[in-house]
Amino acid sequence: MHEGTWRLPPCPRPEVVSLASALGLSETTAGVLVRRGYGDPETARTFLAAETPAHDPFLLGDMDAACERIRAAIAAGGRICVHGDYDVDGICATALAVSVLQDLGADVGWHLPSRFEEGYGVSADTLARLAEEGCHLLLTVDCGITAVDEIAAARASGLDVVVTDHHRPGATLPDCPVVATRPSSYPFPELCGTGVVFKLAQALGVPNLERHLDVVALATVADVVPLVDENRGLVASGLKRLARTTKPGLRALMASARVDPAVVDAGAIAFRLAPRINAAGRLGHPKAALDLLLTEDPQEAGRLAAQLESLNRDRQSVEERILREALDQVEQWPEAKRRRRGYVVAGEEWHRGVIGIVASRLVERFHRPVVLIAGGEDGWTGSGRSIPAFDLHGALAACSDHLERWGGHRAAAGLSIDKENLEAFAEAFGAHADGVLAEDDLMPSTHIDAVVRGADLTLSLCEELEALAPFGLGNPGVTLLAVGCELSALGAVGDGKHLKLAVTHEGARSGAIAFGQGAQLDRYRRALQYDVAFKLQANQWNGTVSPQLVVKRIFDTPDRYAELRKWLADQWRADPGERTAEAAAIFAELELVEEEAGRRHLVESPTFLDILRESFPLAA
């Protein structure tokens, strides 16, 4: 297989048939639901309805006490200051908190930290300044749960504090009301920071709160929290609200990003809207993004959206430059260093605001954990991204003797380091990765939701699969696989970056686009068969709508595939008592009976895949 392989979880056919009958779905869609844990008809109906569960907001941490403090501050006419963060979730949480507090008649101010001057979280200097400026109550959003000492000092100076957050707490909580997903008896701990503020607004009884679901959806998708349970309902409802939003800032942002409000989805948020909001905090100060979300003036909204558009273009340019320089470094490494299973790449004057994005792109390129470090006169800071098999947080812990500060989680982390320790850290990190990662861990594996035939790829199937949206973490877009395809009508598009092609499977031909695979044009022109992994979508062109394959990966179909199909056909025709053990196992795994032969694909059998991929000898 080229570029890794694919994996297909097992799926009991009787459950698929039963669910398809109960819900009136194709077996393809029913199979996707069963593989994702929605095999029970009622559970599947609830999932497809994407309604927001009515979880009680007062189960969320110290909600009663928080509401009491906020209401008291409003009644006393005291100023409430909302302290947020510089990413999309922190900006949206600040905008939502400011808006709902104003709806309740509060005197509200806000503070967003600079990534470069204050860094993440709550600083003692900031809290002291806010107290001096007359802040009566500090409300943190998307931050604060680990700021134990800072909040203690603020309270000692007379500043009242309420913390709302969704990050993991330390061993000790701040000595104030804490509204957070952990620790809590709340039944769904995966809300983003803006989602927590939304629950606070519910508890406060803010009227007409649904009008702010557009901002909640924006933050929930951007913060890459699981789109299941309450998050799924919030995003589904929020996307409908976003399509008809009256907020001038969001309308201007969609216009600037060329997003049609009528068809806005989670993908548009993740890849078009969120990067523009993030650009403000990545390259400068997040104030412009917050102003955009809060403004009631369409002209100001247009000006601010244009400013974010310019910042996002600058971000893209800086990102591409750093990526090129990082790739050049790796290419110049000696062969032994390139074979390391974990990379550390460092550069002078790289922009700290984008190194996390570049680290993610390097992980995609090299399929191994990467730490990217930017240095300058004010020190060296790094951002790391990982692969599923590697615990990045654990790796930094193992190498912590070389670091000044570090933190994060399994998939992503940050650090600061002294320049003199760079080489030692790179060596220690690479050695740790070599010790815990196997060669197979570095091979990308594409998760398949269902195996299909060319005749299955219809607009009706597009509509069924779209009902599983919104897609994101915990509910990824559906990936289908067609095995043994022929590729034709190949041509490079988009300055040679992408491929347009036709995919034919068992005589049924479909149009396809393969983004970022323009360099593979000559390879795919070979007269071979391929296994194509793709997402199915409805494509509108010149007034017509047709199904289109958005290709994720194309794998060489193993040479033995045709031989194995013929062998199994012979085994099927043989008397059951004369079949080999391998053939009998394959037929059992496919749950085949005489009248249903051919209803399932051979690659749904683990035994068949083992024989196909490992070149086991075939018994006669």
Q: What is the meaning of each model-derived region?
A:
Residues 120-121, 143, 515:
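Short gly/ser/thr-rich secondary-structure transition/capping motifs
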Residues 109, 162, 522:
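Conserved beta-strand positions in the Rossmann-like core of class I SAM-dependent methyltransferases
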Residues 97, 232-275, 279-329, 342, ...:
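Acidic, two-metal ion nucleic-acid-processing modules in DNA metabolism proteins
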